[in-house]
């Protein structure tokens, strides 16, 4: 049986990274699929106000119209050809979200960010198959808050005002815990280089290892926060990658679900301990063995990464 981890690893090997060093910057041209819907409208407006270079949107049957003073197109291909967009964000209901991702892959959009929660896993298995056959498109999500480079580009539903341009790369399976880490790193004066919410579903497009590779190679990123949760083996695989690819950048982690009972889904579709695997303790031990500093309280992420950054500076 093919596991989510195996599919994710294969995708990571097939994708060839391009500039910018961590996926987005102020030059990224973004379109929105589901542009004229309630969610697409609300979050596109927020992105524009933040300064994101939104260049248009897609709503089938509404091509030729204007929305938020931007052009509306019937297809992703048309939008890409007309605007030069290289990223798309998807606010499409679960029954149609996989088709929206496939359309973006077919159009060879470089970055696809799918916010939608509740996409059937069978649909996502088919999407993963398409992703694994190509090297033009990277998917972030689904069921994620998105990605942000503070002060430059916001693609997703995260609150922009808590972010501050800085030096900490944050990758997380949890949206709200991402915001907690952001608020704390802003409060202690470190700020963030890039924040990536990889999503809480079993079949996602970008995993911890993909993000660790980018953060360790990114000159702006001087420290890393990794937020995991119960379910799957993504954290253990990330720990093994760090053992095989040591970095001098401090890595701090928090794993949610320490007291979660086996066999019960805890929020996200992927947050379930099954078959004796995926519990918080095994993830924590694996990360510690890789030299990661694990905090047992999300309230201490900011002070812990600051401490580790200062320790490195004073060596």
UniProtKB/Swiss-Prot annotation:
Key words, A-Z: Ligase, Mitochondrion, Nucleotide-binding, Phosphoprotein, Transit peptide, Tricarboxylic acid cycle
Location(s), subcellular: Mitochondrion
EC number in record: 6.2.1.4, 6.2.1.5
Post-translational modification: Phosphorylated; stimulation by low concentration of GDP.
Active site per UniProt: 268 (tele-phosphohistidine intermediate)
Cross-referenced InterPro entries: Cit_synth/succinyl-CoA_lig_AS, Citrt_syn/SCS-alpha_CS, CoA-bd, CoA_lig_alpha, NAD(P)-bd_dom_sf, SUCC_ACL_C, Succinyl-CoA_synth-like
GO cellular component: membrane; mitochondrion; succinate-CoA ligase complex (ADP-forming)
Pathway(s) annotated for this protein in UniProt: Carbohydrate metabolism; tricarboxylic acid cycle; succinate from succinyl-CoA (ligase route): step 1/1
Cited Pfam families: CoA_binding (PF02629), Ligase_CoA (PF00549)
Binding positions for CoA per the UniProt entry: 36-39, 62, 115-117
GO molecular function: nucleotide binding; succinate-CoA ligase (ADP-forming) activity; succinate-CoA ligase (GDP-forming) activity
GO biological process: succinyl-CoA metabolic process; tricarboxylic acid cycle
Stretch forming the transit peptide: 1-16
Ranges that cross the membrane: none
Binding-site residues for substrate, renumbered to this chain: 179
Recorded catalytic activity of this chain's protein: GTP + succinate + CoA = succinyl-CoA + GDP + phosphate; succinate + ATP + CoA = succinyl-CoA + ADP + phosphate
Coiled coil feature spans: none
HAMAP family linked to this entry: Succ_CoA_alpha (MF_01988)
Record note on quaternary structure: Heterodimer of an alpha and a beta subunit. Different beta subunits determine nucleotide specificity. Together with an ATP-specific beta subunit, forms an ADP-forming succinyl-CoA synthetase (A-SCS). Together with a GTP-specific beta subunit forms a GDP-forming succinyl-CoA synthetase (G-SCS).
Family per record: Belongs to the succinate/malate CoA ligase alpha subunit family.
Main function: Succinyl-CoA synthetase functions in the citric acid cycle (TCA), coupling the hydrolysis of succinyl-CoA to the synthesis of either ATP or GTP and thus represents the only step of substrate-level phosphorylation in the TCA. The alpha subunit of the enzyme binds the substrates coenzyme A and phosphate, while succinate binding and specificity for either ATP or GTP is provided by different beta subunits.
Listed name of the protein: Succinate--CoA ligase [ADP/GDP-forming] subunit alpha, mitochondrial
The organism of origin for this protein: Dictyostelium discoideum
Gene name per UniProt: scsA
